[in-house]
Amino acid sequence: MAEPKPEAAALQAMSINLAMAAAVKGSDVVHSHTWYANFGGHLAKLMWSVPHVMTIHSLEPLRPWKAEQLGGGYALSLFCERTGVEGADAVIAVSHGVRKDILDCYPDVDPDRVSVVHNGIDPDEYRPQPSSETLLRFGIDPSKPFAFFNGRITRQKGLPLLLAAALKVDPTHQLVIVASSPDTPEIAAEVDGLVRRVREERGGLIWIDRFIPREDLIHLHSDAAVFVCPSIYEPFGLVILEAMACETAVVASRVGGIPEIVVEGETGYLVDYKAEATDDFTSALAGRIDELLSDPALARRMGKAGRERVIHHFGWPAIARQTVALYEGLLGGSKISR
């Protein structure tokens, strides 16, 4: 059966809103995530007179490349997000950077309704778990340090920029890239071409273009000397928390919420990104990657500091307490049953 056209898929997502809104009758609070669920939360607020809490993980107006993926469905996602955020009783931004973006994109939203609650992670699940067996299974040389990327093939995640930087990285250094689920055929073809070019011009690229189990990802995070996040737009950066929890140093773009996670010079390095200066960005990215791959002691020190930061600032208990406090504030101080 052929895949539905993007516009049809967007309408199907809208139809799910009706079922979600009907299912929450009798709830004290409705809390939604993503543009289509947020519209469902808005409908539930109208029908059942319950407070609607809306978490913003990213903003549609700041992702114009989504039009390439969604077609006319992008206009629908813009409408749903605006309607939801302007009508919500409380809006949670996953970073201070996102909070600023919300108020810039939607000036009619009362700033007092927008709070920051970071995303969280379970550091007991994501912890150092090295595995030479996993490295060998993927064709990675355990005797050589490597830089690691894990993410979707999208404009947002900056994979073409990382592949351009790979041409500038010391050719004796290994680069391991796990990437799948391209947004469009166009970006899939672009990335395939860049991978071929990197392989022609240098060795040491391990390209894994398929989904791999979480256990294997944790092993790769744990064995990597550095995790690379070259995103051009990143409201938070959960994958960075996953890497840091596994004691991996980070080299990342200085965009969005990333500077709220990575402490410059302590848990990794931040690289300035400007759309009009991508060559400077890829050169700086390659330089920081080489620096950490050439200095294992520094990479280990940053990795250990990163895990400590995750445990103290991004564990789920702290995130849950902040969220429950927001619910109780909306309910006039009434306690939420645990």
PLM segments and residue spans:
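Aromatic "clamp/platform" in nucleotide-sugar-dependent glycosyltransferases that forms part
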Residues: 232
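Nucleotide-activated donor-binding/catalytic signature segment of Leloir-type glycosyltransferases, i.e.
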Residues: 188-211, 215
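Conserved donor-binding/catalytic core segment of Leloir-type glycosyltransferases
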Residues: 141-157, 163-166, 176
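Short hydrophobic beta-strand element within catalytic cores of glycosyltransferases
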Residues: 226, 249-252, 262
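Short alpha-helical donor nucleotide-sugar binding micro-motif in glycosyltransferases
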Residues: 219-224
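Nucleotide-sugar donor phosphate/pyrophosphate-binding loop at the beta->alpha transition
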Residues: 50-53, 61-83, 100
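Carbohydrate-associated surface elements
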Residues: 97, 120
